[in-house]
Design a protein with these regions (language model features):
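Short Fe-S-cluster ligation motifs
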Residues: 105-117, 139-144
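Domain-exit/linker segments immediately C-terminal to small folded modules
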Residues: 97, 130-140, 144
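Histidine-centered nuclease catalytic patch
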Residues: 52-54, 61-63, 74-111
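Short Cys/His-centered divalent metal-binding micro-motifs
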Residues: 80-81, 109-131
Length: 144
C-alpha cells in the first residue's frame, strides 16, 4: 500500500506540469500543428506568443498552498488537489501570475482556482481583488 506522501505527490506533479505547459503554450494549452490557424502561429491580437520563465519548484507550490491554507487566493474557498485530475474542474488549483508580464517566480504567483484564474485572465483591471471581495461580501449579506 502506498503511503500518503506517495499518493499526494502525483497532485503536485500535475500542478507543476500545468505550470510548465502554460509557460510554453499559454493558458489555452497545446495547439495542433495540422492547421496554422489552430496551431498558435496565427493568433488573435490579445494572445501572447512569448514564453514565460519558470523559477518555482514543486516545493514552492506546496509552501504557497499551505501558506494560503489550501484556499483560493482570490475567492478564499478551498481548492481540491484531486480536481487536478478532473478535466476542466473550476475548483482545481491553478498558478496565477500577479504581474502577467513577468514569469512564474515565487514573488509573482498565488494559487487560485481555475475559475478565478480564468476570470482574472479575461479581466485586465488592477482592481480585480477589491471587486471580488466586494462581490463576495454582498453575496454573503444578501444570503443572510
Amino acid at each position: 500500500m502506498k503511503n500518503k506522501k506517495d499518493v499526494t505527490e502525483k497532485y503536485w506533479k500535475r500542478l507543476w506540469k500545468n505550470v510548465n505547459m502554460s509557460s510554453i503554450s499559454g493558458a489555452a494549452g497545446m495547439r495542433t500543428d495540422n492547421n496554422p490557424k489552430l496551431s498558435g502561429r496565427l493568433r488573435k491580437g490579445n494572445q501572447s506568443t512569448k514564453r514565460h520563465e519558470v523559477s518555482i519548484t514543486i516545493g514552492d507550490l506546496k509552501k504557497i498552498f499551505h501558506q494560503q491554507d489550501g484556499k483560493c487566493f482570490w475567492l478564499n474557498i478551498p481548492m481540491s488537489l484531486e480536481d487536478l485530475f478532473v478535466s476542466h474542474s473550476p475548483f482545481a488549483p491553478s498558478v496565477d501570475r500577479i504581474d502577467n508580464e513577468r514569469g512564474y517566480h515565487k514573488d509573482n504567483i498565488v494559487l487560485t482556482t481555475r475559475f478565478a484564474n480564468k476570470g482574472r485572465g479575461a479581466y485586465m483591471g488592477e482592481d480585480f481583488g477589491p471587486r471580488i471581495k466586494k462581490l463576495l461580501q454582498e453575496s454573503i449579506s444578501d444570503s443572510e
